[in-house]
Amino acid sequence: RGLGAGANPEVGKTSAEDHKSEIEDALEGSDMVFVTAGEGGGTGTGAAPVVASIAKKMGALTVGVVTRPFKFEGARRTRQAMAGIEELREVCDTLIVIPNDRLMQLGGEELSIVEAFRAADEVLHNGVQGITNLITIPGMINVDFADVRSVMSDAGSALMGIGSARGDNRAMTAAEQAINSPLLESTMEGAKGVLLSIAGGSDLGLHEVNAAASMVEERADEDVNLIFGTIIDDTLGDEIRITIIATGFDAEANMTQAAAQQQPQQEQRCLLYTSP
């Protein structure tokens, strides 16, 4: 009937299970499925694991990209989100969790609530687009689906960092932004798998690609499977955009390390399934 789940995950779960055949029909023939959701409510929390489970059983590389609620959304919503995230982690090849509270560090004190939720949506979009563009858009250095699968299949938790820069040292600046993105609750130190997307205009230099890739490689495991591709997009002008997806790291140890680092400051086909 087009109604929501009333912030009840069981309602969202039951609704998805009752429409299993329709979901299977929608996913038929997909090599890769992205399940995106805002965790904490009914539909995203309850339905997303059902969709992901179906996709994985059908043989698709299944990637979850979800947001965790803002603190102001309440303790109950946060508890539901954490439970939903753990359930989703069990049925996805790779799960990327974006903490909405971190978005406030990107917008400053003047960030409106409309802008905050729009930013959360944009981060989800950018995460998916950063991966799919590697596969679907030709570049100087191309990446195919097998490359992406080698990094993301049964990888568990993943980190996503995004950076952009113009002018002098733009590649290094963008890479540094992506590596130290406020969206990261953990560091990518010791990552055993990394997808690196570098987008720029036709003036994108090989030395810039090398500099960015080398910086990322230094932070990862010495035997990292680093898959990187370049995308030529002249609409970017002199801007370079870098997206990093890192997998295969010790999340608990890296979160402790990230907290310690912040303490001194006090502070081929892809199908996208979206749950509100």
What function would you assign to each model-found segment?
Residues 1-276:
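Tubulin/FtsZ superfamily GTPase core signature
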